[in-house]
Each structure stands twice: as C-alpha cells, then as structure tokens.
Amino acid sequence: MKLTCMMIVAVLFLTANTFVTADDSGNGMENLFPKAGHEMENLEASNRGKPCHEEGQLCDPFLQNCCLGWNCVFVCI
C-alpha cells in the first residue's frame, strides 16, 4: 500500500514538473496573468499603497511582495 502511494505521488510530481518546465515557444507562461496596461507603463505607481520588502527581508513567494527589482524566494534577493 505504501509503495502504491509513493508511486502515485511520484507520477503526479513528475507530471507537474514536466508541465512547469516544458518549453513554451510562445512565452505563454509569461502571459498567464498579464498586468493592466497602466501598471506596465508606470511600475512605481502600481506598487503604491502596497507594502513591499527590501533585499534580505522575508517575503511571500506566492504574493511576490518584494520591492521593485527584487525576486522572492522566501527572502527578497
């Protein structure tokens, strides 16, 4: 029973990994959640009113709440 569960989890993980890392020549992954036009034109204004975290501070990788120019991997880098 444990082996069956492990096999199911492994297959699900590998399937999800395949979809995430698949080459998308149309850059579809980048355009899943496009920003509004005014946010793309004025990035500083789009972050106004939202708290952001500076480099080295803890952040939420799902919310991507680092200040402009920083990427979130549990810590803004």
Curated annotation (Swiss-Prot):
**Keyword Secreted belongs to the record:** yes
Q: Which positions does the propeptide occupy?
A: 23-47
> Which residues belong to the signal peptide in this entry?
1-22
Localization per Swiss-Prot or TrEMBL: Secreted
Q: Which cysteines are joined by disulfide bonds?
A: C52-C66, C59-C72, C67-C76
Q: Offer a single GO CC term for the protein.
A: extracellular region
Q: Under the GO molecular function aspect, what terms does this record hold?
A: ion channel inhibitor activity; toxin activity
Q: Name one Pfam family in it.
A: Conotoxin
Which tissue types show expression of this protein?
Expressed by the venom duct.
Q: What UniProt keywords apply to this chain's record, in alphabetical order?
A: Disulfide bond, Ion channel impairing toxin, Knottin, Neurotoxin, Secreted, Signal, Toxin
Source domain of life is Eukaryota
User: How does the record comment on the protein's domains?
Assistant: The presence of a 'disulfide through disulfide knot' structurally defines this protein as a knottin.
Similarity section: Belongs to the conotoxin O1 superfamily.
Q: What is this protein called?
A: Conotoxin Vc6b
